[in-house]
Design a protein with these regions (language model features):
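Class I S-adenosyl-L-methionine
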Residues: 21, 31-34, 40-52, 58-218
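Glycine-rich SAM-binding Motif I of class I
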Residues: 1-8
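Conserved SAM-binding motif I beta-strand of class I
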Residues: 15-21
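Helix N-cap at the beta1-alpha1 junction of Rossmann-like dinucleotide-binding domains, i.e.
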Residues: 22-26
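Gly/Ala-rich phosphate-binding loop of Rossmann-like dinucleotide-binding domains
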Residues: 11
Length: 222
């Protein structure tokens, strides 16, 4: 129930990861089930899982709508908001969960994570995370970085905007995915399109360790 970058972060935190997506993911590095994630949650025995991460499609909420409209004569299309039904199902299941989405998504009491709060990340990539357990944010505060808009090269301290499929000033087509992967924290197994949507593994490694601490505490108290 989570994306490729998110999965790597949870793996680093100590989880055994199973990914579920309705779209085939040939580059996914862990066990994978090709199926609608919501249907999977509704119909499968989840007793073997200790926690669930969900990344519902972000197209209904992303600020990249403006970029897409500009390239498609003002057209963007309809995109359903899957967050409410995802939350409803996860609350019924009752296991610790995290729902991730973009800035502007209707998450309830989310925390926000930024690239500048972590070492060795060179993109801000703000993401929101909702949970049914208390999540802490990093002790390092977010630092504003002067980052050019998508396609316009490097900004302060090498920070770059990672999105879209157009050219990037200062890089050729082979260099773009290499630097994007580097900027996201060392991702070297994704395509450019996958990198454009990836969560930095550092985010979910940070959150995954909190999930593991919570799970251990519940077991000790049980």
């Amino acid at each position: 129930m989570q994306g490729r970058g998110a999965a790597e972060g949870y793996h680093r935190a100590g989880f055994e990861v199973v990914g579920v997506d309705i779209v085939p993911q040939p580059n996914y590095p862990f066990e994978f089930v090709c199926m609608d994630a919501i249907e999977y949650l509704r119909t499968h025995d989840l007793s073997e899982f200790d926690a669930i991460h969900a990344s519902p499609p972000c197209q209904a909420h992303t600020k990249a709508q403006a970029l897409s409209k500009g390239r498609n004569n003002g057209k963007y299309g309809f995109h359903e908001d899957f967050i409410p039904q995802t939350r409803e199902i996860l609350l019924k299941i009752g296991k610790p969960f995290i729902i991730e989405n973009v800035d502007g998504a209707p998450l309830e009491n989310p925390i926000a994570l930024y690239g500048s709060q972590f070492k060795n990340l060179y993109t801000q990539r703000k993401r929101l995370f909702e949970s049914n357990i208390e999540l802490k944010t990093p002790s390092t505060p977010m630092v504003q970085k002067k980052t050019p808009t998508a396609g316009n090269g490097f900004g302060e301290d090498g920070f770059i905007a990672i999105c879209g499929s157009g050219g990037v000033r200062g890089m050729n087509s082979r260099q773009i995915p290499l630097y994007w992967g580097f900027a996201l924290g060392g991702i070297d197994w994704m395509t450019r399109a996958e990198l454009a949507e990836a969560i930095p593994p550092a985010y979910t490694e940070f959150l995954g360790k909190q999930l593991i601490d919570y799970i251990k505490e519940q077991r000790n108290n049980g």
